[in-house]
Design a protein with these regions (language model features):
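Catalytic binding pocket for nucleotide-activated donors in carbohydrate/polymer assembly enzymes
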Residues: 56, 151-155, 180-257
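C-terminal alpha-helical cap of glycosyltransferases
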Residues: 261-277
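Structural alpha-helical scaffold elements that stabilize or flank donor/cofactor-binding regions
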Residues: 3, 27, 128, 168-169
Length: 277
């Protein structure tokens, strides 16, 4: 952004769907064109009486450009589960500049580490994967990767290759286990369900880097919200028994969330830029 001159336009293509209140960060940017992909996201940013400074002049509902390729390369009936939690600001080291952080010496004492490490080592999880013939891929957040050596990764769990595209990971998986991450929208775009493991939901928004927005996980989510491992594994088996096809309210949410699933998001963005809305 620092290299944009006053005569140049800043077109914010985005890398994901905004579900939380990021107004404090985004309001500091001079954005001329703001791309969104769901009606709820668009309304939360462009409508009057919200926390954002942007309006219908800047914000457009076109769909994300990269979703065209995501849709095109999707693999149906992929027998892979991704475990992809986000991070917590209070369990990692302080920022040292650029994208690096110091290491937190007591990381393994955190509830975050203990809960996810227990899940990865669950005998029931392993048996479910064997019974239904699924593989598990663990994809930790970049801020958690420095602590990967602390996790006890069993042989049946693969570690995602961080040199490969995340889009490939989404396309080649049938189900996601996360906590609060917006990557759940990527799976939903591909009509794939999500399980939200929220063992620390009461403190999450008090200690993290952003504020809760319009999205309600239990009402708007793309799969069940659970608070303990036992419930998670029960919900997982329910979905595996159904070949990872979403059902009920979760299918309704997936079907109604995105404005476009037609492979023409790039075309719409191009036209908006060319004809200046």
């Amino acid at each position: 952004i620092r290299y944009i001159t006053p005569r140049q336009q800043f077109i914010f293509l985005q890398h994901g769907v905004i579900k939380d209140d990021l107004s404090k960060w985004l309001n500091s940017k001079k954005i001329d064109l703001f791309i969104t992909s769901t009606k709820a996201e668009y309304d939360s940013i462009a409508n009057d009486y919200n926390h954002y400074k942007f309006g219908k002049k800047e914000v457009v509902l076109t769909g994300l450009a990269r979703h065209d390729a995501l849709l095109k390369n999707n693999q149906c009936n992929a027998r892979q589960i991704i475990i992809m939690p986000t991070w917590r600001a209070n369990i990692v080291g302080v920022a040292l500049g650029s994208s690096k952080r110091g290491l937190q010496s007591d990381f393994t004492q955190s509830e975050y580490f203990q809960k996810w490490n227990l899940l990865l080592n669950s005998n029931i999880l392993q048996k479910l994967c064997e019974k239904y013939d699924y593989t598990i891929v663990f994809n930790p957040h970049p801020n958690i990767i420095p602590y990967l050596k602390d996790f006890n990764i069993p042989s049946y769990v693969k570690i995602a290759n961080h040199n490969e595209s995340l889009q490939e990971l989404f396309c080649n998986s049938s189900l996601m286990i996360t906590d609060y991450s917006s990557v759940a929208f990527e799976m939903a775009y591909l009509n794939k369900p999500v399980i939200y493991y929220q063992f620390d939901h009461e403190e999450f928004f008090n200690s993290h880097t952003y504020q809760k927005g319009y999205f309600d996980y239990k009402k708007d989510g793309f799969g069940p919200v659970v608070e303990d491992e036992e419930s998670l594994l029960k919900e997982l088996e329910n979905l595996l028994q159904n070949d990872c096809n979403p059902f009920g309210i979760y299918k309704d949410n997936i079907d109604s969330t995105f404005a476009f699933k037609d492979g023409k998001c790039c075309e719409r963005i191009y036209k908006v830029i060319k004809y200046d809305k």
